[in-house]
Amino acid sequence: MVDETKLNLIEIVLRAYDPUYSCAAHMIVEDAEGNVVFEIVNDE
């Protein structure tokens, strides 16, 4: 299960890699069963 703490850590890593998320225009994280647990969509 992905809780808010894990989501915050993912966001921190993404911001460290690219503060504008420009390289993560559409990112999906799936669990072992293939269920989407986290998705970023950048419409810019």
UniProtKB/Swiss-Prot annotation:
Per UniProt, the enzyme's principal EC class comes to: oxidoreductase
Q: Where does Ni(2+) bind?
A: 20, 23
> GO MF terms on file?
metal ion binding; oxidoreductase activity
Q: Which InterPro entries match?
A: F420-Hydrogenase_large-U (IPR053438), NiFe-Hase_large (IPR029014)
E.C. designation(s): 1.12.99.-
Which positions does the propeptide occupy?
Answer: 27-44
Which cofactors must be present for this protein to function? Answer: Ni(2+)
Keyword set, alphabetical order: Metal-binding, Nickel, Oxidoreductase, Selenocysteine
Instruction: Spell out the disulfide connections.
Output: none
Q: Which residues form a coiled coil?
A: none
The annotated subunit structure for this chain is:
The F420-non-reducing hydrogenase vhu is composed of four subunits; VhuA, VhuD, VhuG and VhuU.
The miscellaneous comment for this protein is:
The large subunit of Vhu is split into VhuA and VhuU. Each contributes two ligands to the [NiFeSe] center.
- Please give the NCBIfam families that the UniProt record associates with this protein: VhuU (NF041786)
Protein family membership: Belongs to the [NiFe]/[NiFeSe] hydrogenase large subunit family.
Full protein name: F420-non-reducing hydrogenase vhu subunit U
Tell me the name of the encoding gene: vhuU
